[in-house]
């Protein structure tokens, strides 16, 4: 499997005309998540690193979450040109002994190799090229995911944010709203005691924001850090813009402070994308980053209140509507 990563990196760097250690190279991959014929694929990451010089520690190699039964693929993006190369492994080739695999050509080792420019400014001016990439699934259905992450990384997206988008498996305005909500809560209800305090999220309603909060706060459902509930259309109308309830909980004192927050995606008059539909959210991903330090532009406080153990149980338990428990609906 290491040889697969090495071959992918070597081939891509030749095609993109990049040298080992080039600071403009980003690598995204499903390796480490994909399992092929019972074989885990994390060793491919070592091959990528050895050949390219990229690493997780340098913030230029990321694993994009995919279910284990999906193919293993590699994506190489050159920030300086916008050019990108997608390579999907040929599953049958991975069954070969190492020496036989080493003898394979690029076309034998990979079932799909596709090159395209995914820089958003290039796509704005060359929509026909974008139509080919997105409409014809140039990256086997991963176009939106890979283009979005690449463009924000290229414009200085923070490591933790990129990592969270990879957990969500793509970048979209919904994930960005999670970053803004997190920053807002952290400013209003800062963690003052790291041994006793943590954040809990009542994700009601749920959307992409909640995956970022799981990563940033370690607020996972399995550890009772997040409780996810949908709202009906009528309930959403009753509390317009409701994003959820966010609690700074002190597990020693068994009490906390809570914010019921609203999020308005249309609160700011952002620059608009005027091209084909595939570019709209990509463009929003980029322009929203200008507000990374101004999350309050999109957020409103619906209610601020105290929480004790009994109320926390009611907010979390099935059969109890958290917005009614909080008194906001």
What is each of the regions a protein language model found here?
Residues 1-171, 180-329:
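Non-transmembrane, aqueous-exposed alpha-helical and coiled segments at domain scale
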């Amino acid at each position: 499997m290491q040889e697969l990563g090495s071959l992918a990196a070597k081939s891509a760097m030749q095609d993109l005309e990049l040298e080992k250690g080039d600071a403009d190279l980003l690598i995204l991959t499903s390796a480490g998540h994909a399992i092929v014929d019972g074989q885990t694929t994390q060793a491919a990451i070592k091959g990528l690193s050895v050949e390219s010089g990229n690493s997780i520690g340098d913030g230029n190699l990321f694993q994009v979450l995919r279910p284990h039964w999906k193919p293993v693929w590699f994506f190489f993006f050159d920030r300086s040109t916008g050019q990108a190369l997608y390579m999907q492994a040929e599953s049958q080739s991975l069954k070969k002994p190492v020496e036989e695999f080493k003898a394979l050509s690029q076309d034998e080792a990979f079932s799909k190799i596709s090159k395209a420019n995914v820089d958003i400014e290039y796509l704005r001016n060359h929509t026909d090229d974008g139509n080919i990439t997105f409409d014809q699934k140039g990256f086997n259905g991963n176009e939106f995911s890979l283009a979005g992450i690449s463009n924000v990384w290229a414009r200085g997206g923070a490591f933790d944010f990129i990592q969270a988008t990879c957990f969500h498996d793509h970048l979209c305005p919904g994930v960005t709203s999670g970053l803004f909500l997190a920053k807002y809560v952290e400013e209003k209800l800062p963690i003052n005691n790291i041994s006793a305090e943590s954040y809990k999220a009542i994700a009601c309603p749920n959307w992409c924001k909640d995956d970022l909060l799981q990563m940033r706060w370690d607020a996972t459902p399995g550890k009772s850090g997040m409780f996810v509930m949908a709202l009906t259309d009528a309930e959403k109308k009753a509390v317009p813009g409701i994003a959820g309830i966010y609690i700074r909980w002190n597990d020693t004192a068994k009490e906390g402070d809570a914010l019921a927050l609203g999020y308005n995606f249309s609160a700011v008059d952002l620059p608009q994308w005027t091209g084909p539909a595939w570019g709209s959210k990509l463009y929003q991903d980029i322009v929203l980053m200008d507000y990374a330090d101004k999350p309050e532009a999109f957020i409103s406080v619906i209610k601020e209140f105290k929480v004790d153990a009994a109320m926390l149980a009611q907010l979390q338990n099935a059969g109890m509507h958290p917005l009614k428990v909080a008194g906001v609906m």
